[in-house]
Amino acid sequence: KEGYPVDWGNCKYECMSDEYCKDLCADRKATSGYCYKLNWSCYCKGLPDDSPIKTPGKCRSGR
């Protein structure tokens, strides 16, 4: 699957570089990833089915 990877609070990972997102996506066993610059968020392709991605609803930050 593909989508924006999220943390425990359904918050996307902000980015400024593709390199950061490639590493983040690789850590989640995705085949590729990049920084989607229109909203400055990491986007992964080829994620395992059990990997959490952004769902509708608010980000519950508490970082």
Swiss-Prot record:
LCN-type CS-alpha/beta domain mapped to chain residues: 1-60
CDD domains recorded: neurotoxins_LC_scorpion
One Pfam family cited in the UniProt record for this chain: Toxin_3
Distribution of this protein across tissues and organs: Expressed by the venom gland.
GO molecular function annotations of the record: sodium channel inhibitor activity; toxin activity
Location of this chain's protein in the cell: Secreted
Disulfide bonds: 11-59, 15-35, 21-42, 25-44
Keyword hit for Disulfide bond: yes
GO cellular component labels: extracellular region
Domain of life: Eukaryota
Keyword Secreted belongs to the record: yes
Keyword tags: Disulfide bond, Ion channel impairing toxin, Neurotoxin, Secreted, Toxin, Voltage-gated sodium channel impairing toxin
Coiled-coil positions: none
One GO BP: defense response
Family indicated by similarity: Belongs to the long (4 C-C) scorpion toxin superfamily. Sodium channel inhibitor family. Alpha subfamily.
Function: Alpha toxins bind voltage-independently at site-3 of sodium channels (Nav) and inhibits the inactivation of the activated channels, thereby blocking neuronal transmission.
Record text about domains: Has the structural arrangement of an alpha-helix connected to antiparallel beta-sheets by disulfide bonds (CS-alpha/beta).
Name this polypeptide is given: Putative alpha-neurotoxin RjAa9
